[in-house]
């Protein structure tokens, strides 16, 4: 059993809490915004559906403060997009993190970016590991639930020098993580950088025709905003959950 501090209460964090809890690991859960994690805390865990079936996963601990989540943790997993990494790195510095930190997902230069934040603050960087993309396709159908429609069957993982033990520990949690020689390989394999833009363009007419209410659950997407849509990691091999119907039913063709 591994003690894992999951940071982030969006769809990715909720999916990680679900899988790691079901696998028997000790999961501590923390989020920067109390409002986002509160529905899960009030419910005592995560209602999940999709590739892991339907059920309820209760983490070992909901942490109100980051040091509480990190206390005794073997690994801290940051399940947040890159725009949050700087703030999370600052919180990890303030909390005095010493365990390995995994960026799930990383971004282009993600581990290098986080290491530089630590050095600039005069703090030694912890062992840093990054993944080339998020390990899940997931969305939150409600504030206290997650729908997981895919799990990566292979993705790239790498660490900065000194993070080798963290990388090996990560691979015990996610055997699909294929180790690379350095973080340049994972950074340059950031498929989201390439895929989100064409996904938004190809979905533009659908999103505009629905007034910003278009969904694409079959791709694990999120509620679309006008003229914007998100498409996740189509070039990664996933275990699709073909049995999960769209809650909105069949979508009509848009002309």
Map each language-model feature to its residues:
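Rossmann-fold dinucleotide-binding core
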Residues: 114-214, 250
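NAD(P)+-binding Rossmann beta1-loop-alpha1 motif at the extreme N-terminus of oxidoreductases
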Residues: 1-51
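Long, compositionally biased stretches enriched for glycine and/or charged residues
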Residues: 223-229
């Amino acid at each position: 059993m591994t003690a894992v501090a999951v940071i982030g209460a969006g769809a990715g964090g909720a999916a990680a809490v679900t899988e790691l809890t079901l696998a028997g690991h000790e999961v501590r859960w923390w989020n920067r915004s109390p409002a986002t994690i509160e529905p899960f805390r009030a419910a005592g865990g995560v209602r999940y559906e999709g590739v892991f079936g339907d059920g309820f996963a209760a983490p070992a601990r909901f942490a109100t403060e980051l040091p509480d989540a990190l206390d005794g943790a073997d690994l801290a997993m940051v399940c947040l997009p890159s725009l949050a990494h700087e703030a999370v790195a600052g919180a990890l510095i303030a909390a005095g993190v010493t365990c390995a930190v995994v960026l799930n997902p990383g971004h282009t230069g993600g581990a290098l970016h986080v290491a530089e934040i630590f050095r600039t603050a005069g703090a030694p960087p912890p062992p840093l590991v990054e993944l080339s993309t998020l390990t899940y396709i997931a969305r939150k159908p409600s504030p206290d639930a997650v729908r997981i429609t895919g799990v990566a069957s292979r993705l790239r993982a790498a660490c900065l020098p000194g993070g080798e033990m963290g990388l090996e520990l990560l691979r015990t949690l996610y055997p699909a993580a294929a180790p690379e020689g350095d973080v340049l390989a994972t950074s340059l394999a950031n498929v989201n950088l390439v895929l989100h833009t064409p996904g938004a363009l190809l979905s533009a007419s659908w999103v505009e025709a629905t007034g910003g209410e278009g969904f694409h659950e079959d791709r694990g997407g999120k509620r679309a905003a006008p003229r914007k849509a998100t498409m996740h990691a189509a070039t990664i091999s996933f275990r699709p959950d073909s049995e999960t119907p769209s809650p909105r039913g069949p979508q009509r063709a848009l002309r």
